[in-house]
Amino acid sequence: METVPKKRDAPVLTAGKGISWMAALKRDKWLYLLLIPGLLYFLIFKYLPMWGVLIAFKDYSPYLGFWKSEWVGFDYFKDFFMNPDFFRLLRNTLMLASLDLLFAFPAPLILALLLNEVRKAVYKRCIQTFIYVPHFVSWTIVVSITFVFFTVDTGVINKLIMSLTGEQISFLSDADWFRPMIVMQSIWKETGWGTILFLAALATVDQEQYEAAIMDGAGRFRRMWHITLPAIRSTIIVLLILRIGSFLNLGFEQVYLMTNSLNRSVADIFDTYVYMMGITQGAYSYSTAVGLFKSVVGIILIFGANYIAKKFDQEGLF
């Protein structure tokens, strides 16, 4: 009796060491196709413009063009560091960035923890929708709303203070109030949107741990402290590293719109200084040098924060 040989199954490609790059590309071709729009966006709008940082090392003139402009090396960086305004700009930027990190970063986490305690889904969705809306409001409108509420003569808040104390507070022109106003605006506008990632992380927490903790008599605070926060610790660390990496990127529009002649001594930061020197005064190479300095500091900060996180046996960004 003749034995019929068994038919071999087709080889299954897995993501192991034996699979070739071309085989993996062919297998996942539709997934890679989905990446093309995103890759094109970053290539065209993020990577190609990076050649422009070279004008920081040139005495760039729009009339001569990029290639004919003279190379000056690090002259503009030296001019910036020797500028009397350098330490004032550095102090203002660090102060405002520190306040933003101290108050604006924890705000979404705290709000997400509070929302996580809301049990009725209808209430939770309504609250989430309400707090997401400010993110889509432009800074121009946010500053306009601030003026409506805090202007000395006609502001709603100042009228209330006047009726209670008989005095008015110059929220918008007093230099001492500039930083608190900026931080309050940032918290109001971005806190709701920032809760999305934290809520997504909270959704992955094992509910059986909460049930076991309740049976052991743990209250809400203890459950949050011993279960919730440790479960989302890696998410918090990654977001903190990213925030530290953009420590000096405070945003131009908000600060520029809130700046006036009375609070300029504390309002001038690197972002507004780059605009003033580059756009209003035409010092393109000088302003590019300032922006490049800020970017280099950001890279150092993100690598440093990631290194420290790993030193403490925490999950880093890379």
From Swiss-Prot:
The gene is lplB. It comes from the Bacteria. Its main location: membrane. Keywords: Cell membrane, Membrane, Transmembrane, Transmembrane helix, Transport. One of its GO terms (biological process) is transmembrane transport. It is found in: Cell membrane. InterPro entries: MetI-like (IPR000515), MetI-like_sf (IPR035906). It holds the Pfam family BPD_transp_1. This is Protein LplB. The chain crosses the membrane at residues 35-55, 94-114, 130-150, 182-202, 236-256, 289-309. Belongs to the binding-protein-dependent transport system permease family. MalFG subfamily. GO terms for cellular component: plasma membrane. It comes from Bacillus subtilis (strain 168). Residues 90-305 form the ABC transmembrane type-1 domain. It is a multi-pass membrane protein.
